[in-house]
From Swiss-Prot:
Its EC number is 3.5.2.3. It catalyses: (S)-dihydroorotate + H2O = N-carbamoyl-L-aspartate + H(+). The active site is at D300. The gene is pyrC. HAMAP family: PyrC_classI_B. Zn(2+) 2 binds at D147, H174, H227. It comes from Fusobacterium nucleatum subsp. nucleatum (strain ATCC 25586 / DSM 15643 / BCRC 10681 / CIP 101130 / JCM 8532 / KCTC 2640 / LMG 13131 / VPI 4355). This is Dihydroorotase. Coiled coil: none annotated. Zn(2+) 1 binds at H56, H58, D147, D300.
Amino acid sequence: MLLKNCKILKNTKFEKVDILIRDNKIEKISENIDITDENIIDIKNRFVTAGFIDVHVHWREPGFSKKETVYTASRAAARGGFTTVMTMPNLNPVPDSVETLNKQLEIIKKDSVIRAIPYGAITKEEYGRELSDMEAIASNVFAFTDDGRGVQSANVMYEAMLMGAKLNKAIVAHCEDNSLIRGGAMHEGKRSAELGIKGIPSICESTQIVRDVLLAEAANCHYHVCHISAKESVRAVREGKKNGIKVTCEVTPHHLLSCDEDIKEDNGMWKMNPPLRSREDRNALIVGILDGTIDIIATDHAPHTMEEKIRGIEKSSFGIVGSETAFAQLYTKFVKTDIFSLEMLVKLMSENVAKIFDLPYGKLEENSFADIVVIDLEKEITINPNNFLSKGKNTPYINEKINGIPVLTISNGKIAYIDKEEINL
């Protein structure tokens, strides 16, 4: 496959090149590659970069295929420019043993159009009491997490970190102290009071991060914080890094894009976990990106049925979809307004992910895996969930206009998504 007339970023400047793909690798990147026997695709001077890597998606299968399937989720991710994703273990059965993990791996092998690497659960059934069969499943999982809930026992988390260090696997944490949730459904603040909805305080997240950073130091383990949302959490991670502790973290697009003030009414589409916090918290997240405290962006793509999201904030399920719109929303909100550079954004979604988790992906260079996304930076669409490839339509960003639309995604040398109106084969 030969991609002609590509525009790539090199040393902060655009260069026009051709990219030759053979098998699953990038064989050559050069001006004017002239090979006639290849499948030639004219990219028409669109932006080309390494495929995005998302370390936080809920693909819902096995167990919850009413919400999403591997088939639909992988195509949605490819449409958003993702070529590698890591799937969360809050499934049925939970991947906490070789047998249960294999059920998920079989579905991925059969139905996914992109590279998908499962997480293993930290604890059996994600109950937080007894460690899963971590040693037995380590070779086939990306890392370990009980995402969807916090590990409440410090001792269980410490034992998990000791095992993670032994296996050279990260411990990835959804940080939430159950004793501080107090029946809340959105951020505890002025807006929750105005809407008459019980709130979840920021300390519900940040206190568990502080605990875990110290445990990670004691265990000498790579500790990664999921979907950071509060200013105190950013501070805790920043201090951990300053002290040489192996702590990294991610932020979601929606926590960068919005805050609780954007919730104008009691609408379950705005319910997510962690919740959208204050304007001050959102600003702290942006500063955390700019100063390097926050390492990467991950979507926390969490599809639900419409029935689960139309019950108001208190009774709806937590979660928002993001695979198909993440890059475009961030490009529109932050790159077009000169808050982030284009180079910074693509690194946050690809190269940085590969770097902190030591992955052989996230590079657009010769001999690297042919994981590529072609983006039309000028193309504008209006977000319409009815057009999503995901089964999940649960987004509050309906009718938002966005630029920077992926039109071709190649994962491991194979076309995973193509906009046939924009790209001619």
